[in-house]
Amino acid sequence: MALLTAAARLLGAKNSSCLVLAARHASASSTNLKDILSNLIPKEQARVKTFRQQHGKTVVGQITVDMMYGGMRGMKGLVYETSVLDPDEGIRFRGYSIPECQKLLPKAKGGEEPLPEGLFWLLVTGQMPTEEQVSWLSQEWAKRAALPSHVVTMLDNFPTNLHPMSQLSAAITALNSESNFARAYAEGINRTKYWELIYEDCMDLIAKLPCVAAKIYRNLYREGSSIGAIDSKLDWSHNFTNMLCYTEPQFTELMRLYLTIHSDHDGGNVSAHTSHLVGSALSDTYLSFAAAMNGLAGPLHGLANQEVLVWLTQLQKEVGKDVSDEKLRDYIWNTLNSGRVVPGYGHAVLRKTDPRYSCQREFALKHLPKDPMFKLVAQLYKIVPNILLEQGKAKNPWPNVDAHSGVLLQYYGMTEMNYYTVLFGVSRALGVLAQLIWSRALGFPLERPKSMSTDGLMKFVDSKSG
């Protein structure tokens, strides 16, 4: 307890609630995640019930006409437990910043990057896991990883011109045949047990996703070669990179980092909100997550890192690989003056450099400092924000996660840009499925906001102003 109290002081008041929760259950040394959840959930249910009884009618915020027409930006309308996006600090996973997660989460033997299993444990429980708990999760996912034969057959028979994200979504939907929740619901299970079945489905799906994703990659880009077998002695990311046919240890380390930092980003983004919305209809884990992946496949959500690489490649083609700052400034101004944006810069919520960009930059500085594409990205980081500030249009002139991730993947030989969003999808499962468990545990109802027509909204405004 003393150690946790000291940690609370070190990490600050914003993390204290997370640490108090951890302290309350510090004696729970079980390596079985479901057992720990069984202890946590009743207490959290009681806490939320009391909170709603006391403050259920409290006004949280106002809704403006611009919010309704502007994609509900800034509208507070969701409860999402696993992560919070602060405009000035960036993402916090259960109260922990990315640098804190990099420092505190368990790592593979000899590795330096956090294991995604540890982040999932943190997202689900609010507690920093032990190495033993993370090892248990790695082994548990290895046990659950096998794909049913009909999904394998389906993947093997997709046409090669079908987009990797379409294949991913279809395969996840087909895995719905394995849903524990769907079967139990059809048999009339009590709603207090919903979370237990959703938990099983989430664990199964996360375990199987690397196999699905690797099979898509091998079929499209490696002549349909076998993904091989899961090794129960390896962690989730290591098995994934092996199945992708990448054996470079640094690439495995990159994948651990990538899968960790792309896992969750508040509840209002398209993939997280879609999963939450579809899940509120009591659609099972597979249907909810497949819907989320269809949202992620949209160019405004999950395709941004491809757009960055296309732009960087075009830049190099037009001005050369070793470009001066002056020529680079001219190119950026030409891009802006032609009505286009600089891909990878700005964010709908953030008002600072994305910490997910920063940790990828640190990885590149350590492992590929002389790579020409990275040097260009670093040069842009030095120049673009000042130009965007000078232009005066951007609310956030700083780079986001997409400004960097594609460059790292390219360096290690993964040049198939159409596939990058699949990696994003595998990672995003950790966050949205952790939340899905809690949505059912807390009994969140069917999401059903009220819509208005333009005429109705105009009449409403007239009645207020008249």
Swiss-Prot record:
Record InterPro entries: Citrate_synth-like_lrg_a-sub (IPR016142), Citrate_synth-like_sm_a-sub (IPR016143), Citrate_synthase (IPR002020), Citrate_synthase_AS (IPR019810), Citrate_synthase_euk (IPR010109), Citrate_synthase_sf (IPR036969)
The entry's keywords: Acetylation, Methylation, Mitochondrion, Phosphoprotein, Transferase, Transit peptide, Tricarboxylic acid cycle, Ubl conjugation
In this chain, oxaloacetate is annotated as bound at R356, R428, R448
> According to the entry, what is the taxonomic lineage of the organism?
Eukaryota, Metazoa, Chordata, Craniata, Vertebrata
Localization annotation: Mitochondrion matrix
> Which family is this protein grouped under?
Belongs to the citrate synthase family.
Choose any GO biological process term that the UniProt entry carries and state it.
heart development
Origin species, per record, is Rattus norvegicus
Q: Does the keyword Magnesium apply?
A: no
In its UniProt entry, what is this protein called?
Citrate synthase, mitochondrial
Transit peptide residues are 1-27
Q: What else is known?
A: Citrate synthase is found in nearly all cells capable of oxidative metabolism.
Q: What residues bear N6-acetyllysine in this entry?
A: K76, K321, K327, K375, K382, K393, K459
